[in-house]
């Protein structure tokens, strides 16, 4: 049975535009390009994307057996899978590494190492499971134009050298394979990013070996350009977060997003840096890690986790894969704590 557009919580203006122009069911929306919907209905691209993300996310569940379930043991097995960060200390702080089926956010100022960590994770996802990898592939969504293939080659080269030393008989590990297994998609504006996220379920079905999705960064196209229409921005971000969380859970993959920092004024002559995109976005992420500078040293703080205590780690970025991100563990109160 086709689900009617009337059954969704849409503004009267959007609902009228859709129905009066022949878009009466989910299928009418899901199988048409955003540009065509805008041309037919007169909706702005942002409005059409908002509708598309909501109806396709719900429609993906249609036809499934609502009584299907997993046992507690199966869920425990799924949630016990982690992707190594290549640093034993950071993995320990996180409880094993980057968890699957969760939305993980890495925040920090420019130059602190967010992109470096993103690329490292893309390579790590291809490592055999006995070395903390996922035996899979990765998708990197680049919004800032900061992807440089030479940096990925350097990390892949270190990974290959590391694996060859650990197990000379290991197969299917080559530079060509490492690069082919990282699917890169560049998004030039936020509407393109939203469209890519909307189409991710289909892409994952076609590329079933993908075990990691990285968005670097989630905030780049959302910091400006909304003309103070922050309610629209919040709706789009929340819809995007819900889609990513759903993907992580249904496809048993790791989802990592990077975020920038912004200045918060807390007094006449006092301010400090906080993650961009506001509190609503922060509540959507399962885990939040903040990278920052202090006394010319890099620090990382695990600020939010449902099962781990807050911890601060001093780190430096080095060359070798088995020490690509060298962390020194310390426990103290975070400067970002409430």
Please state what every model-predicted region is.
Residues 1-66:
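Compact, charge-rich alpha-helical regulatory domains located at protein termini
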Residues 13, 46, 85, 101, ...:
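Charged, alpha-helix-enriched surfaces in structured cytosolic catalytic cores
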Residues 17, 36, 40, 51-167, ...:
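The Walker A/P-loop phosphate-binding site
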Residues 54, 58, 93-97, 109, ...:
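Conserved, well-folded catalytic cores of nucleic-acid-processing
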Residues 104, 139-141, 183-185, 256, ...:
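Hydrophobic/aromatic beta-strand patches that form the interior of the parallel beta-sheet core
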Residues 110, 187-280:
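P-loop NTPase motor core
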Residues 133-230:
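Conserved inter-motif catalytic segment of the P-loop NTP-binding fold
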Residues 234-238, 242-338:
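Phosphate-binding/switch region of NTP-binding enzymes
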């Amino acid at each position: 049975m086709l689900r009617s557009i009337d059954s969704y919580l849409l503004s009267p203006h959007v609902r009228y535009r859709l129905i009066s122009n022949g878009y009466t069911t989910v299928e009418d929306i899901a199988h048409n390009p955003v540009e065509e919907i805008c041309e037919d209905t007169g909706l702005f691209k942002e409005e059409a994307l908002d509708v598309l993300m909501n109806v396709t996310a719900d429609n993906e569940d249609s036809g499934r057996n609502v009584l299907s379930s997993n046992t507690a043991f199966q869920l425990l097995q799924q949630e016990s899978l982690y992707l190594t960060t290549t640093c034993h200390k950071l993995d320990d702080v996180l409880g094993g590494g980057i968890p699957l089926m969760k939305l993980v956010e890495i925040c920090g100022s420019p130059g602190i190492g967010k992109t470096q960590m993103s690329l490292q994770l893309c390579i790590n996802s291809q490592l055999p499971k006995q070395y903390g990898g996922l035996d899979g592939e990765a998708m990197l969504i680049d919004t800032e134009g900061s992807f440089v293939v030479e940096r990925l080659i350097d990390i892949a080269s270190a990974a290959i050298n590391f694996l060859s030393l650990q197990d000379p008989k290991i197969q299917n590990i080559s530079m060509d394979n490492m690069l082919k297994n990282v699917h890169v998609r560049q998004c030039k504006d936020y509407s393109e990013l939203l469209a890519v996220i909307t189409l991710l379920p289909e892409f994952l079905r076609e590329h079933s070996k993908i075990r990691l999705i990285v968005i670097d960064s989630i905030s780049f196209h959302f910091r400006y350009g909304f003309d103070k229409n922050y309610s629209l921005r919040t709706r789009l971000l929340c819809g995007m977060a819900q889609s990513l969380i759903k993907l992580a859970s249904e496809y048993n993959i790791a989802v990592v997003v990077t975020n920038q920092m912004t200045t918060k004024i807390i007094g006449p002559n006092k301010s400090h840096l906080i993650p961009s995109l506001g509190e609503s976005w922060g509540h959507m992420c399962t885990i939040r890690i903040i990278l920052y500078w202090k006394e010319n040293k890099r620090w990382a703080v695990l600020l939010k986790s449902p099962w781990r205590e807050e911890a601060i780690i001093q780190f430096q970025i080095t060359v070798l894969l088995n020490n690509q991100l060298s962390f020194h563990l310390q426990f103290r109160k975070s400067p970002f704590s409430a």
